[in-house]
């Protein structure tokens, strides 16, 4: 199976990178062909162009390569911190440019004037792993956990990926070595579950 792992964090020594590496290694050991993308290290440009916003194909070679991988993968994982209830800018720009109309989704009548979207992605399972410094109960009670809704309903299911697993790890700032080891173990467990879901779909 083809897998795609995308990490959106500016610091290469971040805990997010440790999580992404745990997922990558788990899928490799499970026999997956894994494409790994550190958006910052690759110099991914998050700025959506005017032509792309109109639904025209991107002229950026890296964007086109990411789109091709997104279209061909059987399962995927995205890892990033919670920044004001949203992904960091580089990850949001990756979504804007790579989950492109005609590549990730379309509409029955060929327009976006309220029609129900048709997901085009081949992947049927995805893993979303976020980190934060807000306790999970407060994140849900006060903020409604916007990242869960965004990824699960607003992006992945919108584009045809119906099996979504997500975890929020925190509070990272006050975490212990044991806390982080537990989160990494959880990430590996979830990665295997998502691989199994993709295999069964």
In which residue ranges do the predicted regions lie?
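Helix-loop-strand module that forms the ligand-binding subsite of alpha/beta enzymes
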Residues: 59-152
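N-terminal beta-loop-helix "entrance" segment that forms/cooperates
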Residues: 39-58, 180
């Amino acid at each position: 199976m083809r897998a795609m792992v995308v990490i959106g964090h500016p610091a290469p020594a971040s805990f997010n990178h440790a999580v992404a590496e745990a997922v990558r290694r788990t899928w490799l050991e499970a026999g997956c062909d894994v494409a790994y993308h550190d958006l910052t290290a690759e110099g991914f440009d998050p700025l959506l162009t005017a032509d792309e916003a109109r639904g025209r194909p991107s002229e950026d070679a890296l964007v086109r390569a990411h789109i091709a991988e997104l279209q061909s993968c059987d399962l995927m994982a995205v890892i990033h911190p919670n920044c004001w209830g949203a992904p960091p800018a580089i990850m949001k720009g990756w979504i804007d440019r790579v989950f492109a109309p005609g590549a990730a989704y379309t509409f029955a009548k060929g327009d976006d004037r309220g029609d129900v979207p048709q997901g085009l992605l081949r992947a049927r399972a995805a893993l979303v792993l976020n980190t934060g410094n807000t306790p999970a109960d407060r994140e849900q009670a006060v903020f409604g956990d916007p990242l869960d809704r965004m990824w699960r309903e607003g992006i992945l299911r919108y584009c045809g990926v119906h099996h979504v697993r997500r975890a929020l790890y925190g509070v990272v700032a006050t975490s212990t070595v044991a806390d982080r080891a537990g989160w990494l173990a959880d990430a590996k467990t979830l990665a295997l579950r998502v691989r199994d879901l993709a295999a069964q779909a």
